[in-house]
Amino acid sequence: MIKNNLNKSQMAGEVVTEPLAYEWYGKIYKTFHLATTRLSGVKDDVLVIVEAFKLGEVKRGDFVQLEGSIRSFHEEIEQQRRLVISFFAERATKILDHESVNEVVLEGYVCKPIVFRETPAGFKISDVMIAVNRGFKCDYIPLVLWNEDAERFKDLEMGAKIAIKGRLQSRAYLKEIAPGEVVRRFAQEVSVRCSVCLNEEEVC
């Protein structure tokens, strides 16, 4: 068996959709969307998957605290195969206060060429896709690195091992699918605030 990479996350926020139940290989799971709030006040939408018995009697409008890991899977959306990022909760606790937590810790391997760019506002960004081993499976998780981290990591080759801390964020964007036809889509990625290249043994 391939050794698992580090993949730990904590979330706390408001349940903004009614949990929906489904069965998978004999187990009952529930899925819902969780809203977590940044310091700026912007809300991030997190897709949560959890075994039903661990969630208990939670409904839309409740606040929950979760511990688990970031997962990915492919889904057919609008006749295209797209990567969906989710939070798989191992523990779930209903809470009374309006706490907001969104903390992600990952290690994995660069699995696509890194895309480095600079925004009109002068921000430097590196888009990085990492593969995080999970037994015989692998989760593909997109990262966004900013400014100094973006510069430092832009020339990493595929296969380089990195570790990061950050938050799972969501954003809307416009995509042209045909001449003159633009659709609004949503992406989820981990915004990195602290990073280290394990190959080089640099300190975060």
Protein language model annotation of sequence segments:
Residues 1-204:
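Single-stranded nucleic acid-binding surfaces, predominantly the OB-fold ssDNA-binding core
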